[in-house]
Design a protein with these regions (language model features):
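Accessory DNA-engaging acidic/polar modules
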Residues: 1-57, 61, 65-102, 188-192
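Short linker/helix segments within small regulatory modules
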Residues: 64-66, 111-121, 140-142
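Short, non-ligating residues that shape and space the ligands of small metal-coordination modules
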Residues: 58-59, 132-136
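Short metal-coordination and nucleic-acid-contact micro-motifs, chiefly zinc-binding Cys/His arrays
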Residues: 42-45, 119-122, 147-148
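Cys/His-coordinated zinc-binding microdomains
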Residues: 53, 127-130
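Polybasic, proline/glycine-rich intrinsically disordered low-complexity segments
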Residues: 141-192
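Short cysteine/histidine-rich metal-coordination sites, predominantly Zn2+-binding motifs
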Residues: 64-75, 139-152
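Short, intrinsically disordered, charge-biased short linear motifs at domain edges
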Residues: 32-40, 108-117
Length: 192
């Protein structure tokens, strides 16, 4: 069908010129929220690894205001436009083009299985010891770099790359906390 294997990232991807639709049956999972937009960014921060205690880069997928989402409650029929931007967590089912793009940027943010969640999602790995760094500590735990309740101006999250191309995935959408956190990221999204 045209998929390619990246042995370093240990992931299958579909090159840009190949139609991704035939591959969805192999990458589709559960009933998470589906998100889509015409652009997205790769955000980066640093944390200390829980295992080796060395500083390591961590990554997250950010999408600006106006992204569309639908949930299992929508019966998969109604897309709602968001008035806020978001950093996604527990991301699964990214488009193959997006997976290939992420694999070309970093080998430490990749699809891997979580014993806690019971399925694979795009998770971070320590750059020194390869320990899995789960999304709870990064997105849901107070003090995590992608946790939205930072005081204005205190986040160290950088927008590394912005892509003006179709984006779609399944994952958890975060709202609330300090809207200025999202506003700052959105400004970085458009200036990257």
């Amino acid at each position: 069908l045209g998929a390619r294997w990246d042995p370093d990232a240990r992931i299958w991807y579909v090159p840009e010129r190949v139609d991704a639709k035939p591959f969805w049956r192999w990458i589709s999972t559960g009933d998470e929220t589906r998100v889509r937009n015409d652009s997205y960014s790769l955000a980066q921060a640093s944390v200390n690894c829980w295992r080796c205690h060395k500083e390591t880069d961590v990554f997250g997928l950010f999408t600006p205001t106006g992204f569309e989402c639908r949930t299992a409650e929508d019966n998969g029929t109604h897309w709602r436009k968001s008035p806020l931007p978001t950093i996604l967590s527990y991301v699964t089912d990214v488009l193959p083009d997006v997976a290939g793009q992420m694999a070309s940027i970093t080998k430490h943010f990749r699809l891997d299985t979580s014993k806690t969640r019971g399925h694979a999602y795009w998770m971070n790995h320590c750059t020194s010891c390869q320990a899995k760094i789960g999304d709870f500590a990064l997105h849901r735990d107070a003090g995590g770099p992608f946790f939205a309740a930072h005081e204005a101006g205190t986040t160290t999250v950088k927008v590394l790359y912005t892509f003006s191309k179709r984006f779609e995935c399944k994952g958890d959408v975060s709202f609330g906390g300090d809207d200025l956190f999202y506003v700052a990221l959105e400004e970085r999204h458009y200036s990257a």
